[in-house]
Amino acid sequence: MKTVFIFLITGFEEIEALGIIDVLRRGGVNVKSVSLTDSKQVVGSHQISVTADLMFGEIDFTQAEMLILPGGTTKFKEHDDMKKEVLAFANKGEKVAA
């Protein structure tokens, strides 16, 4: 089953990430949150700790339907492996939201 992956990194905007996850799951979409830190526990911009479903290394990008990067921080640009995968995904014409 195709999956929507939403990336979480320290300082992410909680409402942008959790609101999207909630709406997609209510709609029956397979969505997984992905930690870009060294732990599944990720702290957002308002000090709310969230437990991600997966670590970045666990993703099978061939199963991705869409990639989402919530706002709140510029730290996403520091994660080189994620940037590489997102660019490759976008260059294939796949859906990326930020």
What residue ranges belong to the model's regions?
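Extended, subdomain-level signal for the structured scaffold at the beginning of enzyme domains
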Residues: 1-96
